[in-house]
């Protein structure tokens, strides 16, 4: 299965389709290995997107849930307390 560059939700749906196909047990071994590899790759891409989103939120919100004012010069690094 070719992995397309889609948005998060589309990739998550694609991963779920792979999981469902593999769980059905009706996939030849070679196809199952190919699907598994595609699923692992998708999983890693999704994890990276989630980590990136988490870092973005951490830059915008402090530990108490209050919005931070971003310093454009330091926008790439969250403040440490």
Curated annotation (Swiss-Prot):
The biological processes this protein is annotated with in GO are: DNA catabolic process
Q: Which terms in the Gene Ontology molecular function aspect does this entry carry? A: exodeoxyribonuclease VII activity
Write the record's keywords in alphabetical order, separated by commas.
Answer: Cytoplasm, Exonuclease, Hydrolase, Nuclease
Q: Where would you find this protein in the cell?
A: Cytoplasm
InterPro entries reported for this sequence: Exonuc_VII_S, Exonuc_VII_ssu_sf
Chemical reaction(s) catalysed: Exonucleolytic cleavage in either 5'- to 3'- or 3'- to 5'-direction to yield nucleoside 5'-phosphates
Q: Does the keyword DNA repair apply?
A: no
Question: What enzyme category does the UniProt record give?
Answer: hydrolase
Q: Any idea of its EC number?
A: 3.1.11.6
Family assignment from sequence similarity: Belongs to the XseB family.
What is its biological role? Bidirectionally degrades single-stranded DNA into large acid-insoluble oligonucleotides, which are then degraded further into small acid-soluble oligonucleotides.
Concerning NCBIfam families, the annotation shows: PRK00977.1-2, PRK00977.1-4, xseB
Identify this protein by name. Answer: Exodeoxyribonuclease 7 small subunit
> The organism's lineage?
Bacteria, Bacillati, Bacillota, Bacilli, Lactobacillales
Q: Which gene encodes it?
A: xseB
């Amino acid at each position: 299965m070719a992995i397309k560059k889609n948005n998060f939700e589309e990739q998550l749906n694609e991963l779920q389709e792979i999981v469902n196909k593999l769980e059905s047990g009706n996939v030849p071994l070679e196809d199952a290995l190919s699907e598994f590899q595609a699923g692992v790759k998708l999983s890693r891409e999704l994890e990276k997107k989630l980590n990136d989103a988490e870092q973005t939120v951490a830059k915008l919100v402090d530990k108490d849930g209050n919005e931070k004012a971003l310093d454009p010069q330091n926008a790439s690094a969250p403040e440490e307390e």
